[in-house]
Amino acid sequence: MNFKYLKKTSSLAIGLTLALPTFATDKHNDEKDIDTITVTAHEATKNPGMNTEISEQDIRRDGGTNFGTIMRYQPLISAPGSISGSGSGKSSWDRGGFTGYNIRGLDANRVSIDIDGMPLPIAQGRVNSVGRAGFGSYGIGRDYIDTYMYNKVDIQSGATSVSNANNALGGSVSFQTKSASYYLYPGKTTYFGYQNNYDSSDRSFHQGLTMAGGDDYLNGILVLSRRDGQQTRNNGDSISSYPENWHSNSILAGFGWQMTEEHLINTTVDYNNKTKNSHYDTWDKYGKKVESLDHQRSKNNRFNLAIKDQWKPTAISWIDSLTTQLNYQRTNVYDSTDIRHTTKGNFNTQTNYNTKTYNFITTLVKNYENQKISAGLNGKWSEDESPFFTSAQSQNGRIFPDGDYTKPQADSRSYQLGGFLEDRISFNIKDSNNFYLVPGVRVIYQNTKPRNLENMAVTNINGSQLGKQYSSNSDFQVLPSMSFMYDINPDFTAYLQYKRSAQMPNQNQLYGSYLAHSNMYVLVGDSNLNTETSDNFELGLKGHPVSGVTLTSSAFYNKYKNFIAYTRYRKNFVGTGNRIVYQAENRDKAYIYGAELSSEFNIGKWVESANGLSAKFAIGYNQGKSKSSYLGDKYIEMDSIAPMKSVVGLAWDDPNKFYGVAVTATFQKGKKAEATSRESYGNDGRPLPNSKDDYFRIAGHGIIDLTGYINITKNVKLNGGVYNLTDQKYWDYLSNNKLYSTSDHKYLNMFTAPGRTFQLGLDVDF
């Protein structure tokens, strides 16, 4: 481990942490503070690591209308994506949209996304449709959500904790669906909520309805949401976003039943669907000319059934609580694209990605003297399939005897078994300060195998031959963790932690296929892939250093090996003999280090005349480099590392709760991705040459948002905001780091983020 990076970022994080509280002073002891409620973190709820919660109120206040905008003010979390019509590493039929979340420089499938513990399907790599031009990009993303359906979003930054059944190298984003108990309490047995919003960035209208009723013994909830919108506007001066219109519907029904004094049952059924029609041009890889005029009809849906039992036995001394959850999830993605290609004629392509998953999680908790012992088991079984159809005619029957395109990957079946044990031991020091030791371990076994290989058979490769190429893959991992925490004061804690993490290969990497039927070259997965692993170190501070200040700060260093990428060989491939093969391989190693800080200041705690005034400040910085196993390669900066970002905000909330207003400024440095020739390396014994590609530099930017609300009555609130108030023209780095500097000016302008936009909403709550 290279400790200079941890030392450097630790100094930055701790320096900022110690400096900020000096701007605040506590009130004198003789001052009265009768109306203030102080929320203290009970020792049993303190956890190490950077854990962020975005509440339903945060989503409303910050204009979080979709998968991406809920993260707009997070310093090291973002939602990269692509737009319809982009050409770099994209086919005409790959859909636009968000691909997933990026946390601390790792993105897409290296970040877990789940809803109530049920993981969402993986993002589908584009190499299956465009070959090596699509390395590192995705054709089907992970956006199966409607932000109105959730009470909160829990985020773990960095390697996931041992208690998280959905382990991942980069972190996790967990959406918690609405429940009746969130809105009901003793004395309130009914709830009605209605929300109506308009967002000018994509001219979308939203209507949401939440109804709940019941008591402590039996309650239920019904949530409905409808959205209608168009394409997200860009801010280019020469080309507008290509036209599209979309609609989505979501419904959730749930009930809670206190079946006995010991058992609480919760059941939830939720369904989401979205349809979209798009018209766009597809440009070539370098963004210099249009290759086809396309029309796409897209559909996706997700159905989930969850049953959860919380058992608190009174007659079993070694169990305080046992929580057991069962889930069933089905997802379907369907894209039909009519393509008018300039050289290949007119044809239609239909792509699908369908999954079916069963999930089981159980967690036991026991408090014994100064220990909190947690243990759990989990299991997941899933099937996926990728039906594919094209009417395209082969342009060269000798090279492509079965046409230019075939099924992108084999259908597969996968199951995973896991368990964890964690002991949280507290030691009291001087009757006030606590020291905590938290050892833990997670074990994971995963097995994946291909199915229905006969569906991939072509003229020169039958199902039996494919069975030799695509076989089962399995692995077992032991992932230890160790954390130390110390209470600087009862509400402010320092921590140091180590975690081992792993990311097992997915079906896209194991069984992907491109041109496997051709006599030219082939790009395929590898059934013998090893698991990606990491060692993660983090030092941080979190809590309330002084009255009126909430602060979370961390510095981290992560080291990775066995990153999966593609390597070129000339070798025999089943069914066609010797030729060029690009095959998935555990090719790269990498490291990432950085620091982040988030803080909030209640200025009214120190200056009574400023009661209602608050401020926030957040900053995130990270750096990361990777190196392949190729001769002559060197460490170069990872293109998934976002440039430094800071958020500064000032807010006023009327003490009489009549209105509030906030101004928030977001600043991000510019950055230019560093090109590499790893994807075109001949692997013939000569050193890896430098790349001649030159990427477009993404300029730094600063944008200002102005938001506010008015409580018209106790139950009716009008809220809204103006975003990018100064109409700044800018590009999002993580979504556009592979644009070429030589691309057409119009093409580059197509990728600009929205200019000045506004949102307006009405909330009714009874």
Protein language model features and the residues they cover:
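Gram-negative outer-membrane beta-barrel transporters
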Residues: 27, 370, 427-429, 435, ...
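Periplasmic N-terminal accessory/gating domains of Gram-negative outer-membrane beta-barrel systems
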Residues: 50-102, 107-109, 117-142, 154-160
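C-terminal beta-signal and adjacent terminal beta-strands/loops
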Residues: 59, 121-124, 502, 561-562, ...
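Outer-membrane beta-barrel domain signature, strongest for Gram-negative TonB-dependent receptors
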Residues: 91, 245-384, 545-552
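A beta-strand signature from Gram-negative outer-membrane beta-barrel systems
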Residues: 139-193, 765
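Transmembrane beta-barrel wall of Gram-negative outer-membrane proteins
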Residues: 198-228, 238-279, 297-312, 424-429, ...
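Outer-membrane beta-barrel signature, preferentially recognizing the C-terminal barrel domain
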Residues: 290-315, 353, 408, 412-414, ...
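Signature of Gram-negative outer-membrane beta-barrel scaffolds
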Residues: 372-489, 515-517
